[in-house]
């Protein structure tokens, strides 16, 4: 029965390790001026805000959310390219783990994720979103590896010194820069996963030529469902990622999942903007608040739903096979745009239930939940150790 299948999904969510390629907790806490003091330290354990905390992660069976050390593109213009911001976000995550040693632990390898899972702790592996803080010095890769960074998203919303971004239109390097080629090779040598979410198509193909280890897309979805949205991966890219042994971790943001939802929300945004312009108001003006509230009541946001996330997973399986897909929610990073049924980390069982309904086996579910990502991480580590 349906009720039994739901219980079974919940059981599997807790039986298997669930990884999530991208959770933006660090930056969300930074925006709140989070400090490592007693009254703040409870936030990562239990909070009504945001999409992630310990209690909800336990409920949903999430075991290893990659904490995003996010460096906004504006930091590329700073003298240190955002290195001090990266340091402070890393310290925040290590501080949270130190403050709650019974609940959280930093994880530097798949073996540590597995050990933490056995003792009921949530692993906090770290990935850096935007390679800007490497600056122009390859030695910074070792510096960040030693601080615990295990993947680097080569760029974010703008082209940087390493490569071009899918959100930018300038094609500064027409893909990977000469320095970027060295960065990829050195990441392979150190055992840092190369993350191709956010990069332009030509960057992706350039990286494929150079990498000697499997790649990840930490939080990207399938372009088939969002034609023209360069931030998602095309069918050809997904196939090639599979041939490389890599894994695409599906982003749960509605705009990444469904072009109709994306277009509807964009339409609403334009309507609201026109309404405010008419009154000569900015969205941040106090007089705008009631207008915005009324507009949102009459034109509620559209959301994708959990079935569409499963459609994206199905599509990757069709193109590349069951070994090349995982979860990369972007929780705490996509704002109020999460699908119905996947509003926070407590709801992973809803997605597992949807996959079970489609005939995914227990072995399949285990792979999608986390085994695929841990395999890639192990392979990346093994390549580095063979040097």
What does each model-found stretch correspond to?
Residues 1-174, 223, 227-387:
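N-terminal hydrophobic targeting/anchoring segments and the immediately downstream early-domain regions
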Residues 122, 192, 213:
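A short helix->loop->beta-strand "cap" motif at the edges of active sites that frequently abuts
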Residues 137-141, 203-213:
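Distinct, well-ordered alpha-helical segments
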Residues 172-188, 207-217, 351:
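Alpha-helix-loop-beta-strand connector modules within alpha/beta enzyme cores
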Residues 182-196, 200-206, 235-243, 315:
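Substrate-binding cleft of carbohydrate-active enzyme catalytic domains
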Residues 220:
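Catalytic glutamate of the conserved HExxH
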């Amino acid at each position: 029965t349906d009720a039994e299948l739901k219980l079974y999904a919940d059981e599997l969510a807790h039986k298997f390790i669930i990884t999530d390629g991208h959770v933006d907790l660090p930056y969300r806490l930074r925006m709140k001026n989070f400090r490592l003091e007693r009254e703040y330290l409870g936030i990562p354990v239990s909070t009504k805000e945001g999409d992630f905390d310990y209690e909800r992660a336990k409920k949903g069976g999430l075991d290893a959310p990659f904490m995003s050390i996010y460096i906004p593109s504006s930091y590329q213009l700073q003298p240190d390219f955002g290195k001090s911001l990266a340091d402070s976000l890393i310290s925040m995550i290590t501080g949270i783990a130190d403050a709650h040693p019974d609940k959280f632990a930093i994880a530097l390898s798949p073996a540590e994720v597995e050990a933490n899972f056995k003792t009921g702790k949530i692993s906090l592996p770290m990935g850096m979103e935007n390679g800007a803080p490497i600056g122009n010095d390859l030695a910074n890769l070792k510096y960040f590896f030693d601080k615990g960074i295990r993947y680097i998203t080569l760029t974010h919303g703008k082209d940087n010194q390493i490569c071009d971004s899918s959100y930018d239109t300038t094609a500064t390097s027409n893909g990977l820069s000469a320095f970027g080629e060295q960065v990829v090779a050195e990441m392979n040598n150190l055992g840092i996963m190369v993350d191709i979410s956010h990069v332009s198509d030509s960057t992706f193909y350039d990286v494929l030529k150079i990498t000697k280890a499997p790649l990840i897309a930490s939080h990207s979805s399938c372009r088939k469902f969002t034609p023209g949205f360069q931030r998602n991966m095309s069918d050809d890219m997904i196939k090639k990622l599979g041939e490389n042994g890599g894994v695409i971790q599906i982003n749960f943001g509605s705009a990444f999942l469904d072009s109709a939802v994306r277009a509807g929300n964009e339409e609403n945004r334009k309507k609201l903007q026109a309404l405010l312009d008419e009154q000569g108001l900015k969205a941040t003006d106090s007089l705008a608040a009631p207008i915005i509230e009324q507009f949102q009541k009459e034109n509620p946001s559209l959301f994708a739903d959990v079935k569409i996330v499963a459609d994206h997973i199905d599509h990757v399986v069709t193109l590349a096979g069951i070994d090349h897909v995982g979860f990369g929610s972007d929780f705490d990073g996509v704002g109020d745009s999460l699908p119905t049924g996947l509003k926070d980390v407590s709801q992973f069982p809803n997605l597992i239930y949807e996959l079970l309904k489609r005939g995914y086996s227990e072995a399949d579910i285990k792979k999608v939940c986390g085994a695929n990502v841990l395999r890639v991480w192990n392979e990346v580590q093994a390549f580095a150790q063979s040097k």
